[in-house]
Amino acid sequence: MAKQVKRKSSGITKPDGNRKRGRSEMRTVTRTAARKPRDEEQDDDSSDHSEEEAVHQSNGDDYEDTDGENDEDEDSGKAYSALLTLLKTDNKEKKEKPESFSIEEKDQPSEDENEVAGVVSDNENEDENEEDQQISDNEEEEEVKGLASDPFEVHFNLPSDDYLNKEEKLVLKDHEKWPIVDKKTYADLALTSMLQLPPGEQIEPPLLKSTKLKDYAIKKRVLDSYEKAYGLDLTETDSLIANSILNYRDVNYQYKTFTNKNYRRIYVMHALNHIYKTRDRILKNTTKLHVHKESSNDEDLEFRDQGFTRPKVLIMLPTRNSCYEVVEQLIKLSGTDQQENKKKFNDQFYAKAAPPNNKPEDFKDAFKGNNSDFFCIGLKMTRKSLKLYSSFYSSDIILASPIGLSMILENPDKKKRQYDFLSSIEVLIVDKSNQIEMQNWDHVNTVMNYINKVPKEFHDADFSRIRMWSINDQARLLRQTLVFCEYLTPSINNLVSSKSFNLSGKVKFKPIINSEKSMMNSIGLKIKQIFQRFESGSPVQDPDARFKFFINTILPSLLKTSSYEDGIMIFIPSYFDYLRVKNYLKTSTKFDFGSIDEYTSQSKLTRTRQGFASGKIKLILYTERLHYFRRYEISGVKTLIMYGLPSNPLFYKELIRFIGKSVFKEECELDLALVKILFSKWDAVNLEKIVGNERAPILCNSMNELYEFR
């Protein structure tokens, strides 16, 4: 068996971290490279030490709760010995206290957290017989239609070296365009699908389009667990998603509403099936090699069935509560009899705290339970158990927040930087992508830079067992990427369209949003909404073109077009645009304005909101991320200028209802209130969600630049 690779210092230079930011008033954070607000109070309280301890331990600390794992105590102890000194003052039993709701988010960890973030067990002294204790449920390989009917075999084991070399040139070197080979509309499901295949030849997956899971080559223990929990019949939508996922195609799926959880159990089933097939194949080949070695046959026998390191599935999630829910699903479908370190996991990832009842339902879902965004945990499957807090190099599945993982990949202490454990990821899952984007998408980009990189060192690696496409740095061509979001944004779209090269193809599922079901038609207010288009040459030029149009056209006529001299709100989605506009108003105009954003201290937030509501502050700047994290109902709004369309269509309705609140209080008249939205043709994706699929192309491409709706 190939032993795991031992890593040393990688000497990676950390990129500029200026964009890794968050809400200082909402969380504990010590900023090192992050931008520091210039005109706002900083909340330097380092607060909850018990939470900090959980952050440390979630990166793999395994020195407690050791019942039933004596065979791995030595390995875990070596891996996490650094934690003993670091946490010796913090790992005392904490007294229980009532749980209260707060939003936890960290963009730059404290020094202690940086210490822990890089602790990855690269000194694995796995018992040579450890693999014999792994998954072996005595199942025979499903041979109903031969190996060619198994998508796992077709995708990972059948592509030849010549084929991969040709595709590598076309896809990675020549950057040939991926043709769209199939578009379908499912009117009854209000859904469309688009299939892209790579240039040249394609991997031909088995033509399985059944609504019965038993028709797919799924391991019996997983299938039985799924049947017990949910039954084997799939809805039409779930069948479409399952077909693409189980055939190892990339998937970009918009699940429309946060209440839709069906897709999660499908990808969890797929991840477990992938792990079990991988481990069982390795075990059976190892047995064959042992038998062959003991025989008198001098002929060489070769099996290439693994990567450089053991982890095969990476699941990125926004919060510990979302991680808790996925782990619960993994346990339910794993078919294991016991779970190691489950109590410890519950203590660190589960919480009963809930947001206030007056918040929107999607907000309560996003921030319920333990909403800390700093974690990274390994999960290992054995014959009868599922082990939580396994060291990364002995894990099968890694669950992490992007920031938690990026702090390991680019730890300030170069000696603690690690990325080899991501070298052999074959299934990448990014769930609740919109929440991750609101935290900081830069961390996702950081992780993507390290996935499937050839390891720096190969200590004790058995190259005779490593697949040639791993050795040849072609793993990216076979890695499956699954991205799930409530609504699509350019950054999320790029994960599959630009950062994935899966030769089995890419499928994008897109909801059909007609004008009747658009967000505009759900507002409930007959208010004047003016959409004004400006010319922009390219997405790169868009920020500059937007700013010039705003200061030259919108701002000079703002007081003239508004029926009121106060109550003017300018909503700005991008923080960088917000800083730009704020600086211009401060240095080049005489506007009496206030500004609130995700960095503003609580005291200033309160003062500014009160001043705006009373009319002392005539104009206010308001950012999308502040609205996401607080969901304020701002009083006193009479005129609303949207510098850009909100990425979340629900925010469009909530912002306009600020004016509805003023109308209800008789502070302004509905006929005199105004909403003006700036957009360019590059905003088509966001525009569709608000005005509908039919209207968006007209607004973006027709001769007229001004459109009014009520």
From Swiss-Prot:
It comes from the Eukaryota. GO terms for biological process: maturation of SSU-rRNA from tricistronic rRNA transcript (SSU-rRNA, 5.8S rRNA, LSU-rRNA). InterPro entries: P-loop_NTPase (IPR027417), UTP25 (IPR010678), UTP25_C (IPR053939), UTP25_NTPase-like (IPR053940). Residues 1-150 are annotated as: Disordered. Pfam families: Utp25_C, UTP25_NTPase-like. It is found in: Nucleus, Nucleolus. Residues 61-75, 123-143 have a biased composition (Acidic residues). GO terms for molecular function: rRNA binding; U3 snoRNA binding. One of its GO terms (cellular component) is small-subunit processome. Keywords: Nucleus, Ribonucleoprotein, Ribosome biogenesis, rRNA processing. Residues 16-28, 89-109 have a biased composition (Basic and acidic residues). Its main location: nucleus. The keyword Protein biosynthesis does not apply. Component of the ribosomal small subunit (SSU) processome composed of at least 40 protein subunits and snoRNA U3. Belongs to the UTP25 family. DEAD-box RNA helicase-like protein required for pre-18S rRNA processing, specifically at sites A0, A1, and A2. This is U3 small nucleolar RNA-associated protein 25. It comes from Candida tropicalis (strain ATCC MYA-3404 / T1). The gene is UTP25.
